[in-house]
């Protein structure tokens, strides 16, 4: 069985961990905060704007908007809607911004954590990653307290795009 470490316990990290586990991988998710999903709870003023109807290249900013656009083409809006509806989260359209019907970011986090648990994703909190190194048989991921080994590593730790507690250069 392939082992995968996911760095980051936000929406992207949880979704990556779930998708990897669905494919049969043994997944460990490392989250620096005391709980996963801390920044997720703040999205959309606590309502969780989880995708948008209009996704066009000109709406993405940053040092490499083309790269963001390419990534989004691999998991478009319809795939996002299917992923969440399979977990029982249905979208409400508000002027092109899609929110869960409940208008609660906490509901989105809850179903992501439930699915991760169902898929046997091991979630390690308060694990701040310091170093990622290639090894002879995969990867070594060092935290302040432990060293983990895996066949592959997914870095999904976001960014300090907003002044939200827990945001660092590592996400």
Predicted regions and their residues:
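Glycine-rich FAD pyrophosphate-binding loop
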Residues: 5, 21-45
């Amino acid at each position: 069985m392939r082992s995968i470490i996911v760095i980051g316990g936000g929406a992207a990290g949880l979704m990556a961990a779930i998708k990897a586990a669905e494919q049969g991988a043994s997944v460990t998710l490392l989250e620096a905060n005391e709980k996963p999903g801390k920044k997720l709870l703040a999205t959309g003023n606590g309502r969780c704007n989880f995708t948008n109807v209009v996704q066009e290249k000109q709406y993405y900013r940053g040092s490499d908007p083309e790269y963001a656009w390419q990534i989004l083409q691999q998991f478009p809006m319809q795939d996002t809607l299917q992923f969440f509806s399979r977990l029982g989260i249905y979208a409400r359209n508000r002027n092109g911004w899609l929110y869960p019907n409940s208008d609660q970011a906490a509901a989105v986090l809850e179903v992501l954590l439930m699915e991760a648990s169902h898929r046997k994703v091991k979630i390690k909190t308060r694990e701040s990653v310091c170093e990622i190194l290639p090894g002879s048989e995969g990867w070594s991921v060092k935290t302040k307290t432990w060293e983990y080994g895996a066949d592959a590593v997914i870095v999904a730790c976001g960014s300090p795009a907003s002044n939200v507690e827990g945001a660092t250069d590592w996400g």
